[in-house]
Amino acid sequence: STRKESSAASDVYKRQQMLGFFHPTQLFGTGPIEAAERVVALETQIASHHWDVVASRDSLKTYNPTELGELPDIIQTLLTASGLPEGRVIVMMPSFVDKLAELLVSVPLTDWKLWAIWSILRSRAGVLREDVGAANFEFYGTVLSGATEQRDRWKRGVALAESLVGEDLGKAYVDKHFPADSKAQMLELVDYLVDAYEQRISTLPWMSPETRERALEKLRLFNAKIGYPDTWRSYEGLEFSREGGDLVANVRAGAAFEHDYQVAKVGKPADRNEWVATPQTVNAFYNPVVNDITFPAAILQPPFFDPAADAAENFGAIGAVIGHEIGHGFDDQGSRYDGHGNLNSWWTDEDRARFEELTAKLVKQYDGLVPTVLEGRGESRGVNGEFTLGENIGDLGGLGIAVIAYKNYLAEQGLDPRGPVQTFHAPGATAEIDGQEFDGLQRLFLAWARVWRTAIRPEMAEQYLAIDPHSPAEFRCNVVAGNIAEFYEAFPEASAEALVAEDDRVVIW
């Protein structure tokens, strides 16, 4: 309670400080304190009508096809003014849209103007005067995230350029940092993971033959995007001023170009070859509406992937991530989409019920877990097992399937996962880690652990619990490994103090 009140007070102070850069005449006769209070009051009203994080990720609740002409008049006006053509739209939160329409009419126009000024100032603070950027960082960087200093100016500059012309930078990144043979190796790993999923789905005890065949059909339709797009995006028509130009004007030009680019897609068939991220993004993605997985070039480096590493390490790191992303196609939300990306009920009711029995156990395992960095710091909300369910299913399936894939890889060569050095395009790899020798299965789990070694500030950890559908890194590592039988096979001593009690362990995929 005290912490919330402190945060709310900081929120008002932050806006007061930022709005203080304006002359009162620019704030419609209000001073910065009153303006800040009115902005926060309006934002609070808007936020109160948002759905919670669990409902917001529900693919059925958020799929509400509606004709533009059926929306409240003022919402139609706003969308039309933004360039959206007539036709069908998907309304994710119908009740929120209705309440927003009411606020647009009932809240004084001056409050909306102040809110617009604040929103623009906040979004452009990083490219305005140094004192504006510093004031913005003081709250969003220090108060909310715990950071003590801004990133170097050149790093902020690169991030800005990436936000405006990301794929152009991606070309240069790929040319310099992405070896051609990495793509071939990744595709080989993907094949091993897909085959392992097919093997597991074919023998699932809780799934009926009818649903099993549809799941295998979806798996066969998966597409993998590795490294970089086959066709680069064109930025033709986007013009920036050069030396001595106006930085804010350049940012506005980039934002307008991106807006027009996105609006132009409306009403047209989805481009299944388009990428959801730039090659220099350190992340991986599953896109349910096109049923594909994406692995940008930048994630294909240690600790996730190393073309010169031991097979166990690549299966335990990037292999588990591949399995995680494929697993999103079969998590609590992704499983509602068919192999062509359509929201379609392809499960029998009985299979869906059995699936939800298993996922309920997983929710229970994670619910309320408090990350180490927040222990002893007063009341913490802890992990929300429902909110993080999709990512936890992905993690659990990803590592479990990676173990199967690794065993299959070794079996093809007549090798034993409990034996010494087993390599994958890596003649110089070693079984030693920090001077101690481990067998293949052990090295796979150690690679998984290495991926999740993380340092995080308490402020950021608390923020992530509220907004991030992923569990904290320590639980992504330990809870997942604790559910997998091969972990205790690899480390028998772990059974004495099991990470997850044997009767509570969950295997879904």
Task: For every predicted segment, state its role.
Residues S1, S6-S10, K14-Y192:
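Noncatalytic, helix-rich "gating/capping" subdomain that lines the substrate-entry/channel surface
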Residues E162, G166, G170, G323, ...:
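Amphipathic alpha-helical core segments of compact helical bundles
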Residues L187-G319, I326-W509:
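Zinc-dependent metallohydrolase catalytic domains
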